[in-house]
Amino acid sequence: MAKQKIRVRYAPSPTGHLHIGNARTALFNYLFARHNKGTMVLRIEDTDQKRNVEGGSKSQMENLHWLGIDWDEGPDKGGDFGPYRQSERKDIYNKYIQQLIDEGKAYYSYKTEEELEAQREEQRAMGIAPHYTYEYEGMTADEIKEAQAAAEAKGLKPVVRIHIPENRTYAWEDMVKGKVSFESDTIGGDFVIQKRDGMPTYNFAVVIDDHLMEITHVLRGDDHVANTPKQLVVYEALGWEPPKFGHMTLIINSETGKKLSKRDESVLQFIEQYRDLGYLPDAMFNFITLLGWSPVGESEIFSQRELIKSFDPKRLSKSPAAFDQKKLEWINNQYVKKADRDLLLDLALNNLQEAGLVDKEISPEKMEWVRQLVNIYAVQMSYTKQIVDIAKIFFEEAPELSDAEIEEIKKDDARPVIEEFKKQLNAVPRFTAVQAMNAIQATRRETGVKGRKLFMPIRIAATRSMVGPGIGEAIELMGKEKVNKHIDLTLKQLSDLGL
C-alpha cells in the first residue's frame, strides 16, 4: 500500500495582523509538510463578515513570507482544490447543508436570539449547563412544517442546525494530547451549521474544506479542542473519515504565567511589530519553533533547513509554552552578530530615519558613517531599532550628564586628565580610532594616571556618557568638532562647580 501523501493547511481568518500564536500554527504545519515532502495549503476562512479586516489576508500573507513560510496551494497560487477563500465556496457548503436536511440530519431552526437567551438563563437558574433544546420535540412532520411556515410568515429567518446523536462518545487520538473524548450530551445540543445570513459556521465549513481539499493532518491551537467533537459530528453525518488532529498547547506569558492574550500589553504579539523593530526573520522562525517543540540536544540555534530535517510532532510539548522576551532577544542577537552587514545597515538606517535622526536623502559620506555606527553596535543589538537609543550620544548636540557621571568627573584626577587628553588629541595628525587611543596613552604617560581613573573621565568628557562602544571608535565617529565641544562643555561644568 502506498504511503499517504501528507497534506496540511494553515487557515487564518483575515481579522487583523499575524499573531505569534497563529504564526506558530503556520510554522509547525509548514515544518511538518516540508519534513514529510507533503503539501502546505493556505486557506482564508473569511465567513465571519463582521470581523474581517480590509487588507487582513494580504497583511498575514506578507508576514508569513517574511518569516520564511511558503505554501503550495492558496488564493494567490491556485491549485486543484480551490477556491481557497471560504467566501467563494458558499455554493459548495449549501450543497452539503441541503444534503443533510434532505437526509433528516439537519433542520431549519427559527428560535430567535431572545428566545435562546431566555432558555439559557432558565437553564443557568436551574444549575444546568446552557444548551440548545430541540424546538420540535414531540411534533409530527406535518406539525413541524406548519410551525416553520408560521415562522416564515412572521418574517423570521432561520438558521440550520445539525442533529447530535444521543449517548455517543466522540473520541480521537490527538497527535499531541493522546486520547481525547467528549460525550455527545456535553457538546451543547444541536449546533448551528448555517447562520441566518446564509453563511456557514466555522465548524461546518472547516469540515467540508478539509475533506474536499484532502487534508490529512490538522495541527492547530489548543483552543480548538472543544471544536473537534462538533466537527466529528459533521464528519459522521456526511460519512467521511476525519483527518488526524493535533492540538498544540497554549502560549503563556513567562512573567505572569497567564495565557498570552491580545489584551496583554506587556508583550508584543504581532509579527509586524517585531519586523518594525528590526528583528531578523530567521531568528523569529527559530524562536517560534521552540514555543512548544523540543529539539534533540542542548542547542537552541537552528537554521530553517535543520528544523525541517529534525521536526517531529512527537516532540511537541504537552505543557504550555512560555513566551520569554529575553530569550527572543538573545536568539535574535545571535543572528544579528552573524548577519550580513548590508542587511543590518538597511534595517538600522530605516530605524534611524523613522526616528528622525538621519535624513531620508542621505549622502554617500553619511551612509558610510552610518555603516560604521552599525558595525560597532552590531554585537550589542538585540534588534536594530535599539540603535536609536543606544547610539543617541552620536546624535545629541550636548547630552546632559547623569548624577553618576558628574560624580566621576568631580574626582581629583579627572580635570587634569581631561585637559591633557584634549591637548594630546588635538595634536594627532588624523582623527581616527587609532590616533584617539594613542592620545589616551600619551595622556597616561604625561599624567601618570591609569586604569579607570584615566579612561572614565576621558569617555565622559569626549562622549558625554559613561557607556558606549570602544572609546577610540566613539571618538572617531563623533568627529573632532563635536568631541571638542563635549570636552569644553565638561570643563566648563567643572569650573562652575569650582573644580
Curated annotation (Swiss-Prot):
Keywords per UniProt: Aminoacyl-tRNA synthetase, ATP-binding, Cytoplasm, Ligase, Nucleotide-binding, Protein biosynthesis
CDD domains: GluRS_core
Gene3D superfamilies named among the record's database cross-references: 1.10.10.350, HUPs
Function (record text): Catalyzes the attachment of glutamate to tRNA(Glu) in a two-step reaction: glutamate is first activated by ATP to form Glu-AMP and then transferred to the acceptor end of tRNA(Glu).
Keyword ATP-binding: yes
Family: Belongs to the class-I aminoacyl-tRNA synthetase family. Glutamate--tRNA ligase type 1 subfamily.
Gene Ontology cellular-component annotations: cytosol
Motif 'HIGH' region per record, residues: 12-22
Gene behind the chain: gltX
One BP annotation, GO: glutamyl-tRNA aminoacylation
Protein's recorded name: Glutamate--tRNA ligase
'KMSKS' region (motif): residue ranges: 259-263
Binding site for ATP: K262
Localisation: Cytoplasm
